[in-house]
Amino acid sequence: MYSKVVLDRFMSPNHCGLIKNADVVATFTSEATGDMVKLYLSLDKDKIVDAKFKAFGSPLTICASDIMCEMLFGKTLEEATALSNKEVEDIMDMPKTEKLHASVMLEELVVEATKIYKKKK
């Protein structure tokens, strides 16, 4: 059974979509589950001003992606990489074993997005 938070964000995610001319586009696919998330970021003076995602996967992956995008606003990429999957999991309000893969996947995705952005500069 999913928490109310997971169901609400799965049915009506706030940050699902793409950003035209995004400064960073990073994709991560979980080998364990096959879930895939594509993260789009727009930055202004090295701060994240917009974050959106496209995902194929479980309600947990959709929910975790939506939460992560929300948490990224206003942060630098360095600050974003310091965000932990635990912070996402706390908001999801699910038993740890049920959500771990989704939040860990997103933590790795933010690190990948940071690497891509640094290569572009």
Label for each model-derived stretch:
Residues 1-121:
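Domain-level signature for proteins that mediate thiol-based redox and metal-cofactor handling
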